[in-house]
Swiss-Prot record:
Xref: Pfam families: GTP_EFTU (PF00009), GTP_EFTU_D2 (PF03144)
Keywords, alphabetical: Chloroplast, Elongation factor, GTP-binding, Hydrolase, Nucleotide-binding, Plastid, Protein biosynthesis
Keyword Plastid: yes
Function description: GTP hydrolase that promotes the GTP-dependent binding of aminoacyl-tRNA to the A-site of ribosomes during protein biosynthesis.
Top enzyme class: hydrolase
Chief place where the protein resides: plastid
Ranges of residues in domain tr-type G: 1-125
Protein name, as recorded: Elongation factor Tu, chloroplastic
EC numbers, comma separated: 3.6.5.3
Binding site for GTP: N47, K48, E49, D50
């Protein structure tokens, strides 16, 4: 459930597979779900390389992953696959926080991974000119400030002081945006693609549920009937 919620907002993803163990059952599920919710680009990181003595085993895991990706209509032959050890890199940084690129091979492998992400996953084109819309992923209260709805802005721009509609369960409610925050920074506005927390005036936490949306007033109509395509996962 949590993976689907996060993946549905992604412009790209890093698929982490153990180089020591190879693809696991959940690897297949993650690839399937990524495809079905529309994750457009994937980069693969074969982790725990430090636990593998035979490089041929790493190459075998890479072939397995490429075949698995191709089976779900991802370009398995073209997707970048990087190797490394997240734990070794983390330990190196913790032991010597001033490490620079070129000082440690495990840290360098993480740099290489992020360079592949930057080069392979294109910068998405955002719908900033369309009316504001954000699906609510979570909601919580801040003592002394009010109620905050979090999520990724799908389109448009929202500014502090603007009126927005809360659409979904029950009657549509209007409220005023009193704050926009992203990664603990206060903003004047949020734009399409931003993962933000929006502080709302006059609403209680119980008024908002995950799955409701915030929108520019009058631009969204809720529906009781719709057609869908379902993918059922067994335990």
């Amino acid at each position: 459930k949590n993976m689907i919620t996060g993946a549905a907002q992604m412009d790209g993803a890093i698929l982490v597979v153990s180089a020591a163990d190879g693809p696991m059952p959940q690897t297949r599920e993650h690839i399937l779900l990524s495809k079905q919710v529309g994750v457009p680009h994937i980069v693969v990181f074969l982790n725990k390389e430090d636990q593998v003595d035979d490089l041929e085993l790493v190459e075998l895991v890479e072939l397995e992953v490429r075949e698995l990706l191709s089976n779900y209509d991802f370009p398995g032959d073209d997707i970048p696959i990087l190797t490394g050890s997240a734990l070794q890199a983390l330990d190196a940084i913790n032991n010597e926080p001033t490490l620079k690129k070129g000082d440690n091979k495990w840290v360098d492998k993480i740099y290489s991974l992020m360079e592949s992400v930057d080069s392979y996953i294109p910068t998405p084109i955002r719908d900033v000119d369309k009316p504001f819309l954000m699906a609510i992923e979570d909601v919580f209260s801040i003592t002394g400030r009010g109620t905050v709805a979090t999520g990724k802005i799908d389109r448009g721009i929202v500014k502090v002081g603007e009126t927005v509609d809360l659409v979904g369960l029950g009657d549509t409610k209007s409220t005023t945006v009193t704050g926009v925050e992203m990664f603990q920074k206060t903003l004047d506005e949020g734009v399409a693609g931003d993962n933000v927390g929006i502080l709302l005036r006059g609403l209680q936490k119980g008024d908002i549920e995950r799955g409701m949306v915030l929108s520019k007033p009058g631009t969204i109509t809720p529906h009781n009937t719709f057609e869908s395509e379902l993918y059922i996962l067994t335990k």
